[in-house]
Amino acid sequence: MEEVKGKRTISNTWKLVTRSQTDPFEGMPLHLKEKILMKLKAKIISTFILLSKSWSSIVLNKDFTNMYLIIKFFESLNRPRLLLAVDDREINMQFFHSCSREDPSSDHQTVGCYPDSYPRIWYDFSPPVRGLICCLNNSTKVVIGNPTTCQFETLPRVRTKIYQEIFPFFGYDHVKDEYKVLCMTISDEYYSRSGNIVSKEHKVFTLGCKQKKWRMIECTINHYLTPGTQGIFSNGVIYYFARVNDDQSLMCFVVGSEKFSVVELPRPAVEVLANYGEKIAVTNLLYASNDRLFVWILEDASKQEWSNFCVLVPSWVDI
């Protein structure tokens, strides 16, 4: 509507102002937005999901996520950090990120959060895989979590026949861009005389799949899980200790093909499984009477090839 007063025209027509006209970042080219996000920490990036649709579409894009993880992975090689989970059994579960040497105040953080709705339930945690962790609580629930953003998702309960306990392992298939959880179920009646646990049922859960359920898979290798064993993921394969034909062995599960294989371990007996760069290594435990740490590195699983070196550790008595 317009009114004419003398030679002036007064208009009171409302003009809709969009966010892109008020926010200078909305008109920024896509590659510049991605460049800015690449320099931010994951916890800060997660807040952009609520900022606007354009920023959310970038953050939730799989190509951007994969590129971000690759960049942060190579950065972490020069700035390794520790992730600790502490349960005080009275307040809540807390995660601690260790400090970086360059900026001790920037990377250190304490995050208090619950992987489930019951904070006083204890959890076993698997080693991180691309920033995510797999948790198992004492009510046999498997939980996938992001400790950086404190987001957790409980997977469907593992349906078993007569088996009581479950042992989950976590991995990633880079070809199909899929996270998978390998779960083995056992029962007390399947404990062997030596105390090892017989693996009977093997199931796989694929994160992000439309059918949110566990799938039964076949394992032709009869093996016994070593008590307290913890799986290690590296280059598309989950590794864990087990006994095969009464011999301590290294089991391999290829996440993509969902196939099992076994690697003979070097002698003498090894007791620790760890990542060694982009490879897998096994070591012995250090005792007061033992001053040598033997490290074996798996060079080629298909050829059963290992390399090794020895580290002389000062006597604990002299420290």
From Swiss-Prot:
Membrane spanning residue stretches: none
SUPFAM superfamilies per the UniProt record, alphabetical: F-box domain
Domain of life: Eukaryota
GO cellular component terms listed in the entry, alphabetical order: chloroplast
Domain F-box residues, every copy: 22-71
NCBIfam families: F_box_assoc_1 (TIGR01640)
Protein name per Swiss-Prot or TrEMBL: Putative F-box protein At3g10790
Organism: Arabidopsis thaliana (Mouse-ear cress)
